[in-house]
């Protein structure tokens, strides 16, 4: 990490805390893994390139920083069966390792535009689900989801995690509401529970092995910010109706896509 906590390292920690707190709050509020916010936030606050930002994001998501947020969702009755989490995790681990290897062969510009395209697809899926649900009173599936569907969602989330350096929660939330017909609160709870498991280790290990210059003091700050802010966001989310949460989720995705598109166009 360097030789002691000098002024430069202290600033790196504080910048990391700011990026982590921003990502953690949104993670708890919208039930997504923090990586989708963390990557652009790290690029903005630390001024690093896309590969380094993705490495920071993946490493910072190894500790169970979303524990407070998960507790808030469970306290409001939004539990998720552990067999579902196990199936998601199996797909995620396989996809994450493969995705990180692929990312190593892509340029920063290609990664950024891939990030933008991925976000736009998720926004369309989430918005489509919102329109369909407005005509139905049911917010939860009548039967348990098929195993292959959960593994498949985990695989897509893992691939996005490895290639784009995010936690995959955006994919879990968007796909579980669209394909499995989960209510927004249940989908967000499932996504956050997934963040408690150190599923980004394989992808993070690839980034470290490839020798990217990772800012370890900033990573420590990011972890601290994530830990403190996720529960606050989750507490607010549980007091909001679904008709508010879903449009907020879509707006967030579009805002992230717009920011990354502006970075890519420079």
Where would I find each of the regions flagged by the language model?
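Membrane-embedded alpha-helical segments of transport systems
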Residues: 59-67, 94-95, 102, 193-201
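Juxtamembrane transmembrane-helix boundary motif
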Residues: 1-25, 33, 37-51, 71-164, ...
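Small-residue hotspots at the loop-to-helix junctions and early N-terminal turns
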Residues: 50-58, 188-192
């Amino acid at each position: 990490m360097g030789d002691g906590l000098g002024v430069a390292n202290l600033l790196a920690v504080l910048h990391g805390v700011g990026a982590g707190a921003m990502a953690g709050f949104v993670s708890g509020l919208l039930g997504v893994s923090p990586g989708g916010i963390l990557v652009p936030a790290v690029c903005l606050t630390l001024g690093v390139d896309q590969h380094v930002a993705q490495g920071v994001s993946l490493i910072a998501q190894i500790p169970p920083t979303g524990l407070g947020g998960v507790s808030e969702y469970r306290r409001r009755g939004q539990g998720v069966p552990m067999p579902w989490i196990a199936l998601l995790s199996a797909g995620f681990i396989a996809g994450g390792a493969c995705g990180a290897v692929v990312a190593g062969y892509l340029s920063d510009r290609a990664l950024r535009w891939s990030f933008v395209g991925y976000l736009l697809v998720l926004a369309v899926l989430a918005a489509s689900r919102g329109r369909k649900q407005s005509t139905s009173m049911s917010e939860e599936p009548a039967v348990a989801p098929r195993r292959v569907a959960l593994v498949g969602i985990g695989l897509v989330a893992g691939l996005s995690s490895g290639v784009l350096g995010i936690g995959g929660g955006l994919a879990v939330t968007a796909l579980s509401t669209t394909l499995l017909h989960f209510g927004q609160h249940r989908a967000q709870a499932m996504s956050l529970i997934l963040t408690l498991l150190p599923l980004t280790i394989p992808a993070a290990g690839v980034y470290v092995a490839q020798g990217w210059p990772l800012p370890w003091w900033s990573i420590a700050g990011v972890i601290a910010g994530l830990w403190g802010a996720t529960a606050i966001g989750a507490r607010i989310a549980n007091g909001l109706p679904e008709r508010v949460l879903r449009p907020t989720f879509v707006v967030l995705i579009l805002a992230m896509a717009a920011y990354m598109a502006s970075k890519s166009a420079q």
